[in-house]
């Protein structure tokens, strides 16, 4: 299990390229997602009345993300969806 705390995480530098899901373990804080075109999105994460997870952070679209506050998250590779016939 990989746990992340406050900091900036850059795909290809300190985080392998791929698609990831983030799950809040404790605390709360702001997740700032920066795309390759420098557009940003913000999501409040937390255990109380905030988003408890964020799925689908994709390095093909996102160049980095930042966690602020005292939030502690688990990051995991996103699972491939299996489509039934």
Which residues are covered by each model-predicted region?
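Primarily secretory-pathway and cell-envelope proteins
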Residues: 1, 25-85
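A glycine-anchored, Pro-Gly-centered beta-turn/N-cap motif
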Residues: 5-11, 16-19
